[in-house]
Regions:
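Helix-loop-helix connectors at the membrane interface of multi-pass transporters/channels
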Residues: 127-133, 168-170, 353-359, 391-403
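Short aromatic-rich membrane-water interface segments that cap or initiate transmembrane helices
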Residues: 176-187, 316-320, 324
Length: 433
């Protein structure tokens, strides 16, 4: 009895420290990396995250992907390709409003097949170039790109880690995300949400009616090799998703490896040390530090049973009503994923959902899809709810722009609601009725 009470008290301590950490990060956006790392140190020092679990809590694959892609993207920027793409987009859209929506949709398309963080790192430079040419604030542009990439992460098997987890757990193939058991699958639910959220973005940018100047000379690309390397990265990341039992850091090694290839190529071409120092300087170590700290914090509360307790509470909320359970899973997933990494949450909830469905004697598909859609989209509610958000904010900070929590939520919350509600209804009609 005493042991159980002690565990309960420790869980409360962990939950309290977790809550304080996130409140401080929301309130003091400039100091998020230091707050996260400081909180992680407390979790370790107090034993709430044991030493032997530290390495397991850190997602080195994500950190390597961010570092490698940032370096490769710097070579991409130096080649002038983002400036050319910005010119092409500006030629096709009538005003700033449609430029913002077009960039968000473009990011979403890429993100359906490539990791969300990599997508933001690739598309953000194009957005920054457009904003510089138009002399407009890039903050809402980058936020829109980040939330759109998060939305499309659930569209395909290779779009996001959580989608990969569900595919593996439920033995779903790449094509099962399009049509599953003879019915339109979750891909179409996500695209329905994408249409609704695009309308929301158009409304949020409704005042940006400034005309885009036409007739300007297109930027000349100085080197196409970085572009080929980025396209190669996309192809390799997609291909790697089909490899069974691959090392967990495979994607990270792909990104870092291609960055190294780009640096070596550029160095031998230019004989300039900037070919090496430039990409390395482009790596946002503050963003990496923030994610490093958050991985440890999430590892701490997971070890202390907070995530398991939250999953158990969610399982009890619906009672025996399937629609109530489905509703609870979707919206609780949205809420939890706004503040914690959705990877440990989804990993914990998948067996919970399976046992719930078995107990009720129902097909778990609707609960699986509800879990994935809610957990993937919930991260769009807050600036620290998803790695793509943190990455986008890091890019803006390096460009000299600070992002307030209110700035992010002004776009993130209505975007989330517009994306989740249609998907929530669609999935129930397809698989729940």
């Amino acid at each position: 009895m005493r042991a159980g009470k002690k565990v309960g008290i420790c869980m409360i301590y962990a939950l309290f420290l977790f809550a304080v950490t996130y409140v401080l990060m929301l309130a003091f956006s400039k100091y998020r990396p230091y707050i996260a790392v400081g909180s992680a140190a407390i979790f370790i020092a107090t034993g709430m995250l044991p030493f032997d679990q530290i390495l397991g809590a850190i997602d080195f694959n994500v950190l390597l992907m961010i570092a490698g892609t940032m370096g490769l993207v710097q070579l991409f920027i130096d080649s002038k390709m983002p400036a050319l793409l910005a010119d092409l987009i500006m030629e096709k859209v009538p005003n700033v409003q449609m430029a913002a929506v077009a960039l968000a949709l473009f990011a979403g398309i890429i993100s359906a097949f490539v990791d969300n963080v990599a997508t933001v790192l690739m598309v953000a430079p194009i957005a920054l170039e457009i904003c510089k040419k138009l002399k407009t604030n890039p903050v809402p542009f980058i936020i829109s790109i980040a939330v759109s990439s998060n939305l499309q992460g659930a569209a395909t098997l290779v779009g996001d880690t959580t989608a990969i987890m569900l595919g593996s757990y439920a033995n779903m193939s790449f094509l099962d995300f399009f049509f599953y058991r003879g019915r339109p699958s979750i891909f179409w639910a996500v695209e329905l949400g994408a249409v609704a959220s695009a309308l929301i973005l158009a409304f949020l940018f409704r005042k940006e009616k400034g005309a885009i100047p036409k007739g300007a000379a297109r930027t000349k690309v100085t080197d196409y090799v970085p572009t080929f390397l980025l396209v190669g990265m996309i192809a390799l990341l997609i291909s790697a998703s089909f490899i069974q039992n691959k090392p967990e850091i495979t994607n990270g090694l792909i990104c870092v490896g291609l960055m190294a290839v780009g640096m070596i190529y550029t160095f031998f071409k230019t004989h300039d040390a900037a070919a090496v120092t430039g990409p390395l300087k482009a790596i946002d170590f503050e963003t990496i530090g923030l994610l490093f700290g958050l991985f440890l914090v999430i590892g701490g509360i997971t070890h202390m049973g907070v995530v398991d307790a939250a999953a158990g509470l969610l399982a009890q909320m619906g009672g025996g009503n399937v629609f109530a359970i489905y509703t609870a899973i979707v919206w609780a997933s949205v809420l939890f994923s706004a503040f914690i990494d959705n990877i440990p949450y989804v990993a914990t909830m998948l067996p919970v959902v399976t046992s719930l469905a078995a107990g009720l004697g129902i097909d778990p598909t609707v609960l699986y899809f509800g879990l994935l859609s809610g957990a993937t989209l919930g991260g769009n509610c807050t600036p620290i709810g998803a790695s793509a958000n943190i990455t986008g904010i890091g890019i803006l900070r390096r460009d000299g722009h600070e992002v307030k929590t209110s700035d992010f939520c002004r776009i993130g919350i209505p975007f989330t609601l517009a994306a989740v509600i249609p998907a929530y209804i669609y999935l129930w009609l397809m698989y729940g009725v």
